[in-house]
Amino acid sequence: MLGRFFGRGAGGNWRPPAQELAFASQAGFDTVQIRSDRHALEDELGVDAAELGRLFDEHGLEPVLELLVRYDDDGGAATRALEATLPDLQTVGVLRVHVHPVGHVDPAALTADLAGAAAAAEEAGLLFGVEHNAPGHRLLTRLGEVEALLDAVPRLWLVWDVNHTPADEVGGYLALRERFSLVHASDTPLPETNWHLPLGQGTVDLAPLRGFDDVPVILEIGGLPHSGGPGLDTDEALLDSLAWLRGPS
């Protein structure tokens, strides 16, 4: 359930995978999300895929991967990102991979690209998902867009980001639960979205998150410049957010 929001060189609390996975295991997390912006895991993390897979196995943790993909009126970005990382995914032992699309592309081209990537991932035995964006971005910002995309691409999974979701759309996203491959959890002072605060520092209703026993809930609490970050993903904040997520003992 751990995902440092910012990576190496981005001003957050990044550290080498051996240290990060040891912390996650000792703290009681069961899943760790890797984020790749350049689609080369060794370049991102400083260790090769075989060593990374060994570390995940050693600590008994599930690896999941987020690929940031940038569209510039050109379809195919998600498929290219998946193809570039697929050998590493299989070596590490990743089951759940998703893209976080940014930029601009025609909706039909986006749908076609995600359909192709989802089919390729399914053939490789992977669950391939897409993360929706917060209002103010260009791609997949409203519930209706997400519903239409999932209807058009039955193989595609969804990563629900609670911190991207206006309060009046929460119920609609929960109705899509059977399509969730991951949930991203952080807090925000609604109606503002996309602050990525530690849990308990905003106004998000956390209660629905406590019922996801079959889907990993990833803490993305790094913060953004407008919300006091990056750097809010300290060990103490992650442990406190994990306690919020688990609720009263």
Which residues does each PLM region occupy?
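Histidine-acidic metal/acid-base catalytic patches
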Residues: 2-10, 14-28, 53, 85-88, ...
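Structural motif corresponding to the early beta-alpha repeats
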Residues: 21-25, 30-111, 164, 215-218, ...
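Conserved anion-binding
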Residues: 127-142
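Hydrophobic, well-ordered secondary-structure segments
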Residues: 107, 111-118, 127, 143-146
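Short helix-capping segments at alpha-helix termini
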Residues: 58-61, 120-126, 151-156
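Active-site glycine-centered loops adjacent to acidic/histidine catalytic or metal-binding residues
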Residues: 161
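Residues that form or flank phosphate/diphosphate-binding pockets in enzymes
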Residues: 43, 108, 137, 141, ...
